[in-house]
């Protein structure tokens, strides 16, 4: 058991090192995309399933409340938090539309959709991205594995942050770290003189 525990930590560290080498440009582009949208008076919509939903909620909460320092609230909405809306849509046998309907209702040109999917193949996330494209929104996608169907939907203005791993647990860990990096970069760019 001790060796398995050490192996989990070692694999996580190795994934972090690989991501630190591969992802700074994509994370920087994503952060600047989010910052520019906020500066233009737009908002960020976030979605994911399971652990990815938790990461989406963490991002939205960090924008609305704060990340590490006090600052004005920033507009972000986690689309997975309204159980009445989610179950109403799903009850009509539209499980794949639970996020897309919200994107079509709430999203506007200039807004950003932060779409989080470990494999990039979740139908409801894919449909949300398709809806965001019709609303002239920009997409920041956090993925893993080969990026899945989600990667193929992204245009040149969009940003994919693909974790270099084929293990769901490692990808989800890195998605949380990436969300924290994005929050830090947004705060540091918009409020550079705030102390941690």
From Swiss-Prot:
Keywords of the record: DNA replication
Cysteine-cysteine disulfides: none
UniProt keyword Ribonucleoprotein, yes or no: no
InterPro entries: DiaA (IPR023070), GmhA/DiaA (IPR035461), SIS_dom (IPR001347), SIS_dom_sf (IPR046348), SIS_GmhA/DiaA_subfam (IPR050099)
Family: Belongs to the SIS family. DiaA subfamily.
Subunit structure: Homotetramer; dimer of dimers.
Role description: Required for the timely initiation of chromosomal replication via direct interactions with the DnaA initiator protein.
Protein name in UniProt: DnaA initiator-associating protein DiaA
